């Protein structure tokens, strides 16, 4: 019995000293290949939040559409932009309708970044349609969102900034004359 204990202690010490010389296993590597989930969009809650077939709520990373529902954020946005709450909600409906037309009922691939959930327990993701359309980018490109960068989820931040600048200069979506969000 004492001999078995002695052998276990020796193995433990050998493992402890050899550990630094071996690379981590693939699943322990946070910078490994992206992880994906495939599902169907069953509901578009607002312009930047979807619900999947398994009832998972997905907040699209990197973009922020105008608020549709009454909230503290809606009040802050109204104060910041000097726009009436009803105007912001109207812009929010336009963004939601665009997102709904783009992906409602369609099969999607969800890609993750560093953090997988937000403080509201929504799944954070980049969403792609079967044809390869990058939903987050398409919403930004068509002018229905502003860039929202929340580190550490910054994988496509530069792309989103370029798309926002182009949509603004082309006066697309919410940047049309008289409706812009700023």
Predicted segments, located by residue:
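Small beta-barrel nucleic-acid-binding modules, primarily SNase/OB-fold domains
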Residues: 2-182
């Amino acid at each position: 019995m004492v001999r078995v204990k002695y052998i276990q202690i020796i193995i433990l010490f050998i493992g402890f000293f050899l550990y630094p010389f071996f690379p981590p296993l693939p699943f322990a590597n946070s910078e490994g290949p992206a992880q994906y989930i495939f599902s169907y969009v069953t509901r578009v809650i607002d312009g930047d939040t979807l619900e999947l077939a398994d009832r998972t709520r997905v907040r699209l990373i990197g973009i922020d559409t105008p608020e549709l529902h009454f909230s503290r954020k809606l009040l802050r946005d109204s104060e910041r932009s000097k726009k009436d709450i009803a105007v912001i909600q109207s812009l929010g409906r336009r963004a939601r309708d665009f997102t709904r037309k783009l992906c409602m009922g369609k099969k999607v691939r969800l890609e993750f970044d560093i953090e997988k959930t937000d403080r509201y327990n929504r799944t954070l993701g980049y969403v792609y349609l079967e044809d390869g359309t990058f939903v987050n980018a398409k919403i930004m490109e068509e002018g229905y969102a502003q860039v929202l960068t929340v580190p550490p989820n910054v994988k496509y931040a530069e792309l989103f900034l370029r798309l926002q600048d182009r949509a603004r200069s082309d006066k697309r979506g919410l940047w049309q004359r008289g409706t812009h969000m700023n």
